[in-house]
Each structure stands twice: as structure tokens, then as C-alpha cells.
């Protein structure tokens, strides 16, 4: 059974994409778009112009995290394209893998920026923490992965027996 855990934003209703509902939903660290600096067009509401749905292409390509639990492998993919390998640390703390990235203030095309993040992921019980590896792709995606231990217990059917007494005291059989 493969399990993919995506960014929680994807599971939000469509209407909630139209405007940030909380301060944490706002897009910090992103530059303003030209449309946000100009007066609103009468045909388009300023509410819609500032909505994340109009910013989706640039927004969805930065900072995404995906955890996958496949039949034979556990993996985490994290967009860290704004960090060099020297600015990243991956470590195991008990049953968690922690990824930390930090770079000091530096100038970019929009001014000065400093970034820092810290992510923790629970290591599945069937993964040996000593087998965890990490790699950074050319396009800035950090992959942390490990093989899953294969179960030695073979699959078997378990028969169902019928009891003559109710599971809940006082319940009557209908």
C-alpha cells in the first residue's frame, strides 16, 4: 500500500484558496506581483487579484514537502532550492528525522532576504534509522529515504467465530 502525504493546502476547499483566511495562510517571502501594485481593474475584484489562486504557479513550485510510505521504501522530498548543501542539516532524533535549513541575510533581485526552516518527520516503526540517507538533486529537491523492513510473518486468513453472548452488556439480539 502506497501512502502519499501532500501539502495540506491541496485538501482545502476551492473557495478558501481565494483569500488567506489566517495570517499563516499569507505568502511571506514572495515578491509582490505587478497586479498588486496597480489599481484594481473594474472587471476584476481586488479580492481575487490578491488571491493565491492567481499566484499558484510560482507559489506551488517553492517550499513543498511530500512524504511517501511505499511498500518497500520510506521517503521525504522537500523543495530546498534556496539553500546550498552547506546550509542544510539532516539528523535523526529518536523516532524523528529533522531537516533544518538556514542562510543568513543576503541580497537578491528584490532586496535582502534571510531564510530558515525546520521540519520533522516521524520515522515509521519498520524503518531502521541507521539506513536513512539523503541526497540533493540539481533542481534543489532534498530526498531523505530509507528501505522498509520486510515482514517475516506470512499472510494468513483468520477465521471468525460466533459467540452466544452480546459484546455489550444488556444488548438484545434482534
UniProtKB/Swiss-Prot annotation:
Residues 55-163 form the sHSP domain. Lens as well as other tissues. Keywords: Acetylation, Eye lens protein, Metal-binding, Zinc. InterPro entries: A-crystallin/Hsp20_dom, Alpha-crystallin/HSP_16, Alpha-crystallin/sHSP_animal, Alpha-crystallin_N, HSP20-like_chaperone. The keyword Endoplasmic reticulum does not apply. One of its GO terms (molecular function) is unfolded protein binding. PROSITE patterns: SHSP (PS01031). Zn(2+) 2 binds at residues 103, 105. The keyword Acetylation applies. Residues 149-166 have a biased composition (Basic and acidic residues). The modification N-acetylmethionine is found at residue 1. GO terms for cellular component: cytoplasm; nucleus. Residues 148-174 are annotated as: Disordered. Zn(2+) 1 binds at residues 82, 110. It comes from the Eukaryota. One of its GO terms (biological process) is response to heat. Heteromer composed of three CRYAA and one CRYAB subunits. Aggregates with homologous proteins, including the small heat shock protein HSPB1, to form large heteromeric complexes. Inter-subunit bridging via zinc ions enhances stability, which is crucial as there is no protein turn over in the lens. Belongs to the small heat shock protein (HSP20) family. May contribute to the transparency and refractive index of the lens. This is Alpha-crystallin B chain. It comes from Anas platyrhynchos. The gene is CRYAB.
